[in-house]
Amino acid sequence: MTSKLEQLKQFTTVVADTGDLDAITRLKPVDATTNPSLLLKAAAIPGYADLLKQVKADAKGNVDLACDKFAVAVGSGILKVIPGRISTEVDARLSFDEPALLNKARQLIALYEAAGVAKERVLIKLASTWEGIRAAEQLEKEGIQTNLTLLFSFAQAQACADAGVFLISPFVGRIYDWYKKSTGQEYVGAEDPGVQSVTRIYNYYKANGYNTVVMGASFRNIGQIEQLAGCDRLTISPELLQQLSDDQGELPQVLKPGNAGEAKQHLNESQFRWAMNEDAMGTEKLAEGIRQFARDQEKLEKLIAEKA
């Protein structure tokens, strides 16, 4: 019997959710994703110490630019050991400023191209705010493909599909966390609200012919991953990838394109904002996620600023 990880790879593109080059080399994912929190974690790895000093020197004291250069350097290194693409995130503090998001995204792509990386191997990650979705729509028209992250609500998924974004990252574990805290209940298997959210989005996209890729993210256990086997892509931490690699049990495909989904519905800005207002979980987790990424971005800036 092959491992659950190898079985999963038969019907889902497996993505590593980490900036740890050693883990990526060992676990052999197709793609990789990073975010400000993962970059902060990577910055603590001794092997990156010289790189932090180098990007600070190259940026000539511009800490914001140094952070971008660090993200691109980490991403470029990862691309040397994976066949697919890297997702690099725009500063979360820009999440409600469409022009600033566009400028930052274009700057990241320019830095990648200066490092010899074609834009076709990069996905720009943006928070799934209304402004982030609109920025993504414009970037896609420019040939810059996007990954819409911090996606917790069905309304966000609907708006992303309408905008024609390349990929969305609906979060499973953080939805689970919210409901567990809110109700005091444990959720297992198909009863997990995070699993139900991604399943609903996947079925909606496939039923209505959307090309946007669904990449489930933010997992707390391999049970959640097993329930989403068959999803277009799943981005998984090295720890859970290792658990899947060590498990020789059977892993059947759960999500399939032929499953029934809801009828297509287009949302304008006011409808989107109202739907978000009515979704307490989605609103709280989006705001919390942006705050957390913003804090970690500030910590990374401080870390780089303090480097000799």
Curated annotation (Swiss-Prot):
GO CC annotation: cytosol
Subunit text: Homodimer.
Subcellular location as annotated: Cytoplasm
Protein name per the record: Transaldolase
Its job: Transaldolase is important for the balance of metabolites in the pentose-phosphate pathway.
InterPro entries reported in the protein's UniProt record: Aldolase_TIM (IPR013785), TAL/FSA (IPR001585), Transaldolase_1 (IPR004730), Transaldolase_AS (IPR018225)
Entry keyword set: Cytoplasm, Pentose shunt, Schiff base, Transferase
Active site: K125
Main location: cytoplasm
Pathway per the UniProt entry: Carbohydrate degradation; pentose phosphate pathway; D-glyceraldehyde 3-phosphate and beta-D-fructose 6-phosphate from D-ribose 5-phosphate and D-xylulose 5-phosphate (non-oxidative stage): step 2/3
Family indicated by similarity: Belongs to the transaldolase family. Type 1 subfamily.
GO biological process, one term: carbohydrate metabolic process
Pfam families linked to this entry: TAL_FSA
Top-level taxon of the source organism: Bacteria
Gene from which this protein is expressed: tal
